[in-house]
A protein has these predicted regions:
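Enriched for short, Lys/Arg-rich terminal
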Residues: 62, 69-97
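Arg/Lys-rich, positively charged N-terminal/basic patches that mediate binding to nucleic acids
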Residues: 1-37
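A short, surface-exposed loop/turn module that caps and links secondary-structure elements
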Residues: 45-69
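Glycine-rich, flexible loop/turn motifs
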Residues: 1, 9, 46, 54-57, ...
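Short, solvent-exposed, low-complexity loop/linker segments
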Residues: 26-54
Length: 97
């Protein structure tokens, strides 16, 4: 379950709000995919559930994002988050590369 968002843009996308912040977070054509990924993240109770479907490409991040995980939206866009006590915290949509 999602507990917190890292920014308002990601929260707007999750809630289906068409805001300037949401438009700056990722291209509009990706919004349906982003919402589907965020809904999936909100439903899981165990991090391993995000490994299915394989297209999510669940990853543990390193470097400046150590402690975070990500699932893939497309080649560049990711949903990044911290997984703690069965919940997703600091959820954000980002161009990871």
């Amino acid at each position: 379950m999602i507990r917190t968002f890292a920014d308002n843009a990601s929260e707007d996308l999750f809630n289906g709000v068409d805001s300037r912040r949401a438009r700056s977070a990722c291209p509009r054509e990706l919004w349906p995919i982003v919402r589907r990924k965020l809904t999936q993240l909100n439903r899981v109770r165990d991090l391993r559930e995000l490994a299915i479907p394989p297209g999510n490409r669940l990853e543990r991040l390193s470097g400046s994002r150590k402690g975070q995980h990500s699932i893939r939206v497309n080649q560049q866009c990711r949903v990044c988050f911290r997984w703690e006590e069965g919940h997703a915290d600091e959820v954000e949509i980002t161009d990871y590369h």
